From Swiss-Prot:
Zn(2+) 2 binds at C815, C889, C896, C899. This is DNA-directed RNA polymerase subunit beta'. Binds 1 Mg(2+) ion per subunit. Mg(2+) binds at D460, D462, D464. It comes from Photobacterium profundum (strain SS9).
């Protein structure tokens, strides 16, 4: 019997599917799902609690209410399985069929499906080529629509009002056919010939010229083709049969007191059934048309509400005024099916409790309370008790555990040994938020956590809680141990730096231990080794800080991995020698023997240990460091008292000086010498400087102390002040915080980011007065409000990033591409922000790296650059390397190993199946909460170092100018006349050391290739105005300068000099609106002077607000300034910072006023102007000129006649990433986004590897727009996956046909997530209704490639350990598809062989 059952069950196995397809259901299909028609709106009999027959809970249709028992009770027990009771008609089977059996309702009149009607763009409307308004009027019985015009002059699908219809009836009788309601729409859809429509549209597409029409046609064509290809029938968008959800999925639960709690769906279904039955009765009675019509309309509305309540008209509400939850609401949103039940499930075998410190634990351990362990490991304990024969049955074992007998604890110890548990702290922002530990049983009720993993969990012990999960199966335990054990996660996946780094107490202890003190007890001793040093310390013959000589043995590994040692006397301190005892062999003593061992140095120590000696040593070392640190922190006795905050004596004089300066500025302002804005800025500058000076004085005062040395002389040494030591070691606090404690609090910001000009001169030691306290609260409250917003925004960013990147998995070893991105060191101004070595570390070289100036290959192609290679590049002064990148990987799905490079968390080449997309998303999203929300205003002490007005080089070398145009002025200095010029300083090896932007009009004292010495000032400019510089010499001639109309004269009161100011267009009278004030240059005869190398006259148009300080017909030389444009407006543009900036970059949002870039290479000219815009024309040397209209208020960087390259900046502003992609290509846009995102994170001191950002960029670039379709089935203008085009092109090329040409698109992460191939993934992200509607119409097939889809359908994900499972299935499937070779048994084979041989012999 059992085997029979097994056989029956096997038929329904749904494991073996490779894809999920979604489509429209035909009425027949709905009937085939159904187990019977629901005819009555009744649910259950409230007296007997039995379901009503033919009602919404009918047992005959949906199955029995009790297991193996029919409704009337005639058949009970298993033996009657499968019998259908003749009395009540119920099949005797399990109740759970009530979760899967569906019913149906035969609708008396067809009804349109609201999703295909109202979800924009309306599918029904697009298909019928009618406006949505018109279709609605037909469906809701307001108008007639012509279905068959016959011989009349009406047209098909023409709308007729009631009167028009009656007139037509009178005129033509029944020659034509017109109807209303869903029947009419159904008839129209049924009459469509899709093939004919397609041919018609393709013809129209050939002929049409208008862009809008072409777009509309393409949309409609794609829809019609989708219907044809998917085998969906357009009529199926109109429902004539409505499926009914199985009753256990819309339960009715009796509450005590005779009331019922019910799912909203039951109410909605009841309304549909009531109206449907009433309509049937009305039709039978042949009621008047108007009544029937009203009933049909009501039926349509009730079905609309059932499918998607609130989409049309007001939402139907229940008894408590709350809108009812329809079928659509069930699946969408955070509480919907996708996100609540399919992507996030609850787990059994878990517990949670408060965490506390376990400083004596080893790194791989955690303390688990006995109570919790007993509960969590129950099944294992029961099993063990039974296996030992201590309990006869599970029930007996249960009893023993409940009584907590002595033997149970012994068994628990055994069970727990070597059985890892997983600890998780919410919010889990990156993969280190869940790690595995070996449990150690402890008393008490709190989980004990190892202090070093706190950084990864972002945990502290102020009441945080953590959850424990038990991996049950052997595979799960193995994975937890091999992959998730805390000892295997020493490096952060975001940056590749150690994340198991001591902080706070431990750092302070080690720092204190390794400091030196002058003339301490025991100074000058000679010690035989670390052990003797420790002895000396313990016997109080020497203190920790005493400077002594110790005999130290250092070990080092050579290339072959052999240990060699050398011993020598080293000047050091007692503390450092003691610390050396725990340092593993193979590290140099210099790492310990430093001025002070702060947090950075300890991090370096651990990193070096990991790279040189491997994981095991590092783990042991980290634990030892922690124990030592804690011990010596306790011995140090560092604590904070109010006297430790030393206030510098100079503070009060500095403040008095600043106050005097402010008073002076105030006087100047009152006498009208400075404007309000200037006064404000100057006051803030004064206070910012004063604050800096007080802070400096305070730190100088705190950081050194004077002591008497052995010779009795005074000497300076680093201070042992507690506050200073905490900050200096990196344990807690920073210079900025000490400044508030003992310096002055300084300037405070208002919530809008502007700075209050009254500073807080007091510090926390002195205490604030009421006014100062009030000013402080202003910004502080903003900070708290920001934090709450930030957390939500950051979480949403992470969610979008994960969604867009989830299907990037390492799928292949090498895609073989030669493409890549060129890496150079990041230089801003005079300092190197990031060395080349740091940027290319862990990358794979795309082309051979040559030694500069030779043909010698330093690093061959496909080398993984590790630390040693990077040092080699550094030694040979290589200044650019082309490395492979995720962005340029040519794999169709996922990415290859070489393009990704090193697995940052493990330190070797990445493995296949690694889910690099999700790791990238987590790495970018996790620090999100640390980023600021604020938009920075320039003009605050925060960001205003005095405006730059010159360049002073910081290193010696030679100077280079890049894409610079310049003229030489009368003083034979160079004046820059180009916009995007860059000046770099190069050392003798040709490496770029510094890089500066040169603004237009800067005056250089050195030329290209000249040598410069450190400290030289090589360029100056005026930061507050933008000059207009003449490129020719001649006499000035003013054009359109009319006093009071286009210009006004102003005389400076102080200097008596007069200047001419051009009026803004808004200030001019109507007469001056069309005039363009221009400065022309003429020679002595009055003829125009030409710009050298062109036939353009030299004339300079002046924008509004420009100031001219020349008189008409003055003589000017080359490079002289004709006019200045004040740069006030430009300076106060808000710079969006922090989190919003990162979100903007990844969403690829166009900035408000983007930079205007040249679309083609050519010469600039201006054409006819309109009211608010001017016409920019770029004429190439050959081909069509390009025109663009630009707002007049945009300041242009080009003058008439200038030559521009494609992608040059014409008007300044933030660059739009789409423009960069279009004009400069994929590499440029990738570099732009990477640098901009890194800029934000670098400001916050967060380190993220470029790889992660590139992974996201790859996903943003995965769509292309078809330009020419070639011989493919794509349409021009269609947006397609990059991979699909590549696959199609390879096939076309192989067949020798025309390939597709396309342009790459940049999509924001939200758009990109919704545009994935997988509709399941897109639907579970956002806009569920729209995604599913679109997918259903085009009959989409989801190949289940990404991680999310597989989680939703309940499979292993195709990454990590699940990767091999999916590959195995794939291979199995391919094997099934291949023709099977005929099987031959051994005897047959030997006979065949003999026959062949005989044949061969008999031939002779």
């Amino acid at each position: 019997m059992k085997d029979l059952l097994k056989f029956l069950k096997a038929q329904h196995k749904t494991e073996e599917f490779d894809a999920i397809k979604i489509g429209l259901a035909s009425p027949d299909m709905i009937r085939s799902w159904s187990f019977g028609e629901v005819k009555k709106p009744e649910t259950i009999n409230y007296r007997t609690f039995k379901p009503e027959r033919d009602g919404l809970f009918c047992a005959r249709i949906f199955g029995p209410v009790k297991d193996y028992e029919c409704l009337c009770g005639k058949y009970k027990r298993l033996k009657h399985r499968g019998v259908i009771c003749e009395k009540c008609g119920v099949e005797v089977t399990q109740t759970k069929v009530r979760r899967e059996r569906m019913g149906h309702i035969e609708l008396a009149s067809p009804v349109a499906h609201i999703w295909f009607l109202k979800s924009l763009p309306s599918r029904i409307g697009l298909l019928m080529d009618m406006p949505l308004r018109d279709i609605e009027r037909v469906l809701y019985f307001e108008s007639y629509v012509v279905i068959e015009p016959g011989m009349t002059n009406l047209e098909r699908s023409q709308l007729l009002s009631e009167e028009q219809y009656l007139d037509a009836l009178e005129e033509w009788g029944d020659e034509f056919d017109a109807k209303m309601g869903a029947e009419a729409v159904k008839a129209l859809l049924g009459n469509m010939d899709l093939n004919a429509e397609i041919d018609l549209m393709r013809e129209e597409l050939e002929e049409t010229n208008s862009e809008t029409k072409r777009k509309k046609l393409t949309k409609r064509l794609k829809l019609v083709e989708a219907f044809l290809l998917s085998g969906n029938n357009p009529e199926w968008m109109i429902l004539s049969v409505l499926p009914v959800l199985p009753p256990d999925l819309r339960p009715l639960v009796p509450l005590d007191g005779g009331r019922f709690a019910t799912s909203d769906l039951n109410d909605l279904y009841r309304r549909v059934i009531n109206r449907n039955n009433r309509l049937k009765r009305l039709l039978d009675l042949a009621a008047p048309d108007i009544i029937v019509r009203n009933e049909k309309r009501m039926l349509q509305e009730s079905v609309d509400a059932l499918l998607d309540n609130g989409r049309r008209g007001r939402a139907i509400t229940g008894s408590n005024k709350r809108p009812l939850k329809s079928l659509a609401d069930m699946i969408k949103g955070k509480q919907g099916r996708f996100r609540q039940n399919l992507l996030g499930k609850r787990v059994d075998y878990s517990g949670r409790s408060v965490i506390t410190v376990g400083p004596y634990l080893r790194l791989h351990q955690c303390g688990l309370p006995k109570k919790m362990a007993l509960e969590l490991f129950k099944p294992f304990i029961y099993g063990k008790l039974e296996a030992r024969g201590l309990a006869t049955t599970i029930k007996a074992a249960k009893k023993m555990v409940e009584r907590e007998e002595a033997v149970v604890w012994d068994i628990l110890d055994e069970v727990i040994r070597e059985h890892p548990v997983m600890l998780n702290r919410a919010p889990t922002l990156h993969r280190l938020g869940i790690q595995a530990f070996e449990p150690v049983l402890i008393e008490g009720k709190a989980i004990q956590l190892h202090p070093l993993v706190c950084a990864a969990y972002n945990a502290d012990f102020d009441g945080d809680q953590m959850a424990v999960h038990v991996p049950l199966t052997l595979e799960a335990q193995l994975e937890a141990r091999a992959l998730m054990m805390s000892t295997n996660n020493i490096l952060s996946p975001a940056s590749g730096d150690p994340i198991i780094v001591p902080s706070q107490d431990v750092v302070l202890g080690l720092y204190y231990m390794t400091r030196e003190k002058i003339n301490a007890k025991g100074e000058g001793m000679y010690l035989a080794g670390p052990a003797e040093a420790e002895k000396a310390y313990l016997t109080k013959n020497a203190v920790l800080h005493a400077r002594v000589k110790v005999r130290i043995t250092q070990y080092a590994y050579d290339e072959q991995g052999n240990l060699s040692s050398e011993t020598g006397l080293i000047d050091t301190t007692v503390g450092r020698a003691i610390l050396w005892q725990i340092v593993p062999k193979g590290l140099p003593y210099s790492l310990v023997n430093t001025e002070a061992l702060g947090k950075k140095q300890i991090s370096t120590l651990l990193n070096t240990c990991y790279r040189k000696l491997g994981m095991k040593e590092t783990v042991v070392f980290a634990d030892q460091i922690m124990y030592t640190g804690f011990a010596y922190a306790a011995l140090s006795g560092v604590s904070v008292g109010i006297d430790d905050m030393l206030i510098p004596k100079e503070k009060y004089t500095k403040i008095a000086e600043a106050e005097a300066e402010v008073a002076e500025i105030q006087e100047q302002f009152q006498s009208g010498l400075v404007t309000a804005g200037e006064r404000y800025n100057k006051v803030i500058d004064i206070w910012a400087t004063a604050n800096e000076q007080v802070a400096k004085a305070m730190m100088d005062n705190l950081s050194v102390e004077t002591v008497i040395n052995r010779d009795g002389e005074e000497e300076q040494q680093k201070s042992f002040n507690s506050v200073y030591m905490m900050a200096d070691s990196g344990a807690r606090g920073s210079a900025a915080q000490i400044r508030q404690l003992a310096g002055m609090r300084g300037l405070m910001a208002k919530p809008d980011g502007s700075i209050i000009e009254t500073p807080i001169t007091a510090n926390f030691r002195e205490g604030l007065n009421v006014l100062q306290y009030f000013i402080s609260t202003h910004g502080a409250r903003k900070g708290l409000a920001d934090t709450a917003l930030k957390t939500a925004n950051s979480g949403y960013l992470t969610r979008r990033l994960v969604d867009v990147a989830q299907d990037v998995v390492i799928t292949a070893d090498d895609c073989g591409t030669h493409a890549g991105i060129t890496m150079t060191p990041l230089i801003e101004g005079g300092d190197v922000k990031e060395q080349l070595g740091d940027r290319v570390l862990g990358r794979v070289v795309a082309d051979d790296v040559l030694k500069p100036g030779t043909d010698e290959v330093l690093a061959p192609r496909n080398t993984l650059l590790d630390e040693k290679w990077c040092d080699l590049l550094e030694d040979n002064s290589v200044d650019q390397v082309k490395v492979r990148s995720v962005v340029t990987c040519e794999n169709d799905f996922g990415c290859c190993k070489f393009c990704y490079g090193r697995d940052l968390a493990r330190g070797h080449l990445i493995n296949t199946g690694e889910a690099v997309g999700v790791v990238a998303a987590q790495s970018i999203g996790e620090p999100g909460t640390q980023l600021t929300m604020r938009t920075f205003h320039i003009g605050g002490a925060a960001s205003r170092a005095a405006a730059e007005n010159n360049i002073q080089v910081k290193s010696t070398g030679s100077m280079r100018l890049h894409n610079a145009k310049f003229v030489t002025n009368s003083e034979s200095k160079l004046v820059i006349t180009s916009r995007a010029s860059v000046m770099t300083v190069i050392d003798e090896f040709g490496r770029t050391k510094e890089s500066y932007k040169l603004p237009y009009g800067s005056i250089l004292s050195k030329g290209d290739g000249d040598s410069v010495v450190q400290g030289d000032t090589v360029a100056n400019w005026d930061p507050h105005t933008m000059p207009i510089i003449t490129e020719v010499a001649g006499r000035v001639q003013f054009v359109d300068f009319i006093d009071g109309v286009t210009v006004s004269r102003q005389t400076d009161e102080l200097t008596g000099l007069s200047s001419i100011v051009i009026l803004d267009a808004a200030e001019r009278t109507s007469a001056g609106k069309d005039m363009r004030p221009t400065v022309k240059l003429v020679d002595d005869k009055g003829n125009d002077v030409m710009i050298p190398g062109t036939d353009m006259p030299a004339q300079y148009f002046l924008p509004g607000k420009a100031i001219v300080q020349l008189e008409d017909s003055a003589l000017v030389g080359i490079g002289d300034i004709l006019s200045r444009i004040p740069q006030e407006s430009g300076g106060t543009r808000d710079i969006t910072g922090g989190l919003p900036r990162v979100a903007d970059l990844f969403e690829a949002r166009k900035p408000k006023e983007p930079a205007i870039l040249a679309e083609i290479t050519g010469a600039v000219s201006f054409g006819k102007e309109t009211k608010g815009k001017r016409r920019l024309i770029i004429t190439p040397s050959e081909g069509q000129p390009y025109e663009e209209m630009i707002h007049k208020w945009r300041q242009l960087n080009v003058f008439e006649g200038e030559k521009v390259e494609c992608g040059d900046v014409i008007a300044d502003g933030p660059e739009a990433p789409h423009d960069i992609l279009r004009l400069r290509g994929v590499h440029a846009v990738a570099e732009y986004i990477v640098n901009e995102v890194q800029e934000v994170y670098r400001l916050q001191g967060v380190k993220i590897n470029d790889k992660h950002i590139e992974t996201i960029i790859r996903q943003m670039l995965r769509k292309v727009t078809i330009v020419k379709a070639g011989d493919s089935e794509f349409l021009p203008g269609e947006q397609v996956e990059f991979s699909r085009v590549n696959i199609a092109n390879r096939k076309l090329e192989a067949d020798g046909k025309d390939i597709v040409t396309f342009s790459r698109d940049l999509l924001g992460i939200t758009k990109a997530s919704l545009a994935t191939e997988s509709f399941i993934s897109a639907a579970s992200f956002q806009e569920t209704t729209r995604v599913l509607t679109e997918a259903a119409v085009s009959g989409k097939r989801d190949p289940l490639r990404g991680l999310k889809e597989n989680v939703i359908v309940g499979r292993l994900i195709p990454a990590g350990t699940g990767f091999s499972y999916h590959q195995r299935r794939q291979n199995q499937r391919n094997a099934e598809l291949e023709p099977v070779a005929p099987q031959v048994d051994a005897e047959q084979a030997s006979q065949d062989l003999a026959a062949l041989l005989n044949a061969g012999l008999s031939d002779d």
